[in-house]
Every structure is written in structure tokens, then in C-alpha cells.
Regions:
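Consensus positions within tandem repeat domains that build extended binding/scaffold surfaces
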Residues: 32-34, 54-59, 77-80, 99-102, ...
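Active-site-proximal loop->helix
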Residues: 11
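Structural signature of tandem-repeat unit edges
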Residues: 1-7, 15-29, 39-52, 62-75, ...
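Surface-exposed repetitive/solenoidal architectures
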Residues: 1-2, 34-37, 214-216, 252-253, ...
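A structural signal for leucine-rich repeat
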Residues: 273-276, 296-299
Length: 316
């Protein structure tokens, strides 16, 4: 028997929920943390009339295998289903956005996003290691930062060319990598398996936005060069094609990179890219390229760090 605490239509808490849980009629909202950590709860039936599911409402319910969400739900809060055990879920048609971290670290394998959804939130599916297929609506406008980061098995996703995609949104979604190991979506290159295979990373021609050009980890990698013995080391050099128009601050996240060669006139502004210091010594740009005033002066500390970088202009 599950004992519910309900206040003004909001289900605030369920004491020691186990097995199959049926939420009472008359409830209009599931409160924040209402079922947090209920690992012995296997299924949940939410009745019609519920309009809102609060923040972390079902967070860390690792034993939860199925949940019924009624068509009346229009709002799902941050981290509502973080670390949940279900593999599929049917979302209500009136839902207009997928909030921050809603499904991150969950056991989802596939999901279809309702037609009214315009935005997929920050870290909404991050770390869903078993997620393979996502069906996006045609009217989707924005996929925010880290939305699908580290969904290693994701291999099927339909993205319109006019969708705005945030920083690191598909980083290390290895199932989306091309035959050369690069993850390129709408001409944006994200952190890819190819960047973990060699000390010299050459971004493919046709890429217009560089989200990542080097691995995000700070540890040494094992490189497997063709015809050579495995080598342990860091990514040391990045080559950017002439097609590049934008280089995001996330492009060079760690300090072991020594050289950047750009065939593009796009501005290389470091911004927050090297927050722990850098070994960068040289940047080579094509003749005629222009740098913005004080390109490395994000703050006084950065300006001092980058004072020794050699910038060379030459025919590339």
C-alpha cells in the first residue's frame, strides 16, 4: 500500500513507494522530488488531469520500467527522470519543450519527441548510454548545449538544416560518426572518435563550425597510426580547412595543443578554451587573414598566458 501526501492537488510525497504505483484521481501536479530515489518502484500510472511533473520528481528511480504520462501534461521539470530505468517513454502531445537534464543518465533506448516541441534543453539526454534512436519534430528550432553529449550508441536522428545546435550537443555520439570517425551535423564538427586516434587532427573540408577540434580529456591517449606501433601522447596539432567560418570557444578545451594551422580566415579567439593554461606555441593563418584586436585578451590572465604565441601568416 502506497501512502500519498497531497496538498492542494499537488502530490508532494509518496512514502516508501514499491511495485506498481497508481497515482490517485484529482492530483493536478507531481511535486519536486516526490518519488526521488524510489528504486523499488516498477511502474507508475499518472491519471488524466495532471498538468505538471516537477523537478526531479522521478529522479534516481532506477527500477522504474514503465510510466504512463497523460495527454494533459504540458510541463516537465528539470531532471524529472534523471537516472531512470525505463527504456521507452511516450511523451504527451501538448508538451512544448524538453527541459534541462530531463532524461540524462537514463536507460532510454529510443524516444519520439512530440510535434509541438521547439526546444530540447541543456543536458536533456546527456549520458544516455543506450539511446540509439531519436525522432525529432519538423518544427524543432533549438537543441541546447550538451543535449545529447555522450550518447555513444545514438545512430539514428533526423535534424533539419535550419535547427540551431548548441555547444557540444552531439559530442562523442560515436554512432553518428562517419567512416573517418568524425561527427559532423549541419556542417558542425563535434568531439569525435577521430580526435582520440592521432596526435595530428585534420578537420575535414566542408565543416563550417568547429565545436571541438581536440579531445576534451586531459589525460594521455593511445594513438593507433596505420602501420606503426601504438603511441601514447597528447593531441599536438590541429589543421582547420578553408571552409571553416566559426570557431567556438569549446574548440580547443585543454592545454596540451602546441600548434594550430588554419586554412580559413575565420577568427581564432580563444575565449574560455584554455582555462587551465596552454602549451600553444604557434598559430598559422593564410595570407590576408585578419585577427580581431587583442584576440587572446579574454582577461588579463589569458593575455599574459598567450603573449608568447607566435602568429604566422603564409600561403597554405
Amino acid at each position: 500500500m502506497n501512502d500519498f501526501i497531497i496538498q492542494d492537488g499537488v502530490l508532494v510525497e509518496c512514502e516508501e513507494p514499491t511495485g506498481d504505483v497508481v497515482i490517485p484521481e484529482g492530483v493536478t501536479a507531481i511535486g519536486s522530488n516526490a518519488f526521488w530515489g524510489a528504486r523499488n518502484m516498477h511502474s507508475v500510472y499518472i491519471p488524466d488531469g495532471v498538468k505538471k511533473i516537477g523537478e526531479s520528481a522521478f529522479g534516481a528511480c532506477s527500477g522504474l520500467k514503465s510510466i504512463r504520462i497523460p495527454h494533459t501534461v504540458t510541463s516537465i521539470g528539470t531532471d524529472a527522470f534523471v537516472c531512470c530505468g525505463f527504456e521507452t517513454i511516450e511523451l504527451p502531445p501538448k508538451l512544448s519543450s524538453i527541459g534541462e537534464g530531463v532524461f540524462r543518465l537514463s536507460n532510454l533506448r529510443e524516444i519520439s519527441i512530440p510535434d509541438k516541441v521547439k526546444t530540447i534543453g541543456y543536458k536533456s539526454f546527456k549520458g544516455c548510454l543506450h539511446l540509439e534512436e531519436v525522432k525529432l519534430p519538423q518544427g524543432l528550432k533549438l537543441i541546447k548545449d550538451d543535449a545529447f553529449r555522450d550518447c555513444h550508441k545514438l545512430k539514428n536522428i533526423n535534424i533539419s538544416s535550419d535547427v540551431e545546435i548548441g555547444w557540444s550537443a552531439f559530442g562523442m555520439c560515436n554512432g553518428l560518426a562517419d567512416e573517418d570517425g568524425f561527427i559532423i551535423i549541419n556542417r558542425i564538427v563535434f568531439e569525435s572518435p577521430a580526435m582520440h586516434r592521432t596526435a595530428i587532427v585534420e578537420i575535414p573540408d566542408g565543416v563550417e563550425i568547429v565545436d571541438h577540434a581536440t579531445p576534451s580529456g586531459d589525460s594521455e591517449l593511445v594513438y593507433y597510426e596505420k602501420g606503426k606501433e601504438p603511441v601514447t601522447g597528447f593531441c599536438r596539432k590541429v589543421i582547420l580547412p578553408s571552409s571553416v567560418k566559426t570557431i567556438r570557444p569549446t574548440a580547443f578545451p585543454w592545454g596540451n595543443l602546441v600548434e594550430i594551422v588554419s586554412r580559413s580566415n575565420a577568427n581564432i579567439t580563444v575565449g574560455l578554451s584554455f582555462p587551465w593554461g596552454t602549451k600553444l606555441k604557434k598559430i598559422t593563418l593564410p595570407k590576408g587573414a585578419e585577427l580581431p584586436p587583442n584576440p587572446f585578451s579574454y582577461n588579463a590572465e589569458y593575455a599574459k598566458t598567450f603573449a608568447g604565441i607566435k602568429i604566422v601568416f603564409e600561403s597554405i
